[in-house]
Amino acid sequence: MLLVVVVSALTISDLSAQSDAKIQAAFAESYKAELSGYYVLSVSELRAVYQADNYSINARLGWLLFLSKQYTESVNYYDKAINLKPYAIEARFGMIKALNELKSWDKVKEQYEAILKIDDQNTTSLYWLGVLLYNRKDYDNAAKNFEKIVNLYPMDYGSVIMLAWARLYQGKTGDAKVLFNQAILLSPNDPSATAGLNQIK
């Protein structure tokens, strides 16, 4: 009985090793095809060894389908990857790229917010969520996002100038003036900051 158990364990181990080797080989071929711009071939290499419960395969298929401009399919695979590893933000950023192309702005917003629940100081999410809110004229919430970045990185021009404009549209001209001048310090003769200051005068 013990011998049967040992043999069974070895068989399972051997099968697992063979499966790992096939997946590794498929990834290697997939990378080669991607570098040559053969995205369809790159996708087919991975589909040949597809496992629904494999995060890496799903995330990589999401990326390759994005490169192939198959954005809806890309989102579907990224969604599978996210379900497998909900705290991995890389798949969420990948999905955002595809959602941007689909102009699914509400879903983009949802993903940025989901990332910030995992990592509340993720500056990429803070910035682009801020831009999205700013473009919707939600200046109060946009300013909150930009302010968090400026507190962390006071010399980050992009966040300083966006916070300056958000403050201006909030009617906080005193704060806006300080921020526009800071933007000029970081980017001499900056046209956006100069235009902002001209509106305050």
What do the PLM-derived regions correspond to, one by one?
Residues 52-54, 86, 120, 154, ...:
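Short coil turns that delineate tetratricopeptide repeat
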Residues 169-201:
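Terminal, low-structured helical/coil segments at or just beyond the last alpha-helical repeat
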Residues 22-51, 56, 60-67, 97:
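Alpha-helical segment of the N-proximal tetratricopeptide repeat
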Residues 35-44, 68-80, 101-114, 135-148, ...:
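Structural signature of tandem alpha-helical TPR/SEL1-like repeats
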Residues 23, 54-57, 89-90, 123-124, ...:
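Helix-start (N-cap) detector for alpha-helical repeat units in TPR-like alpha-solenoids
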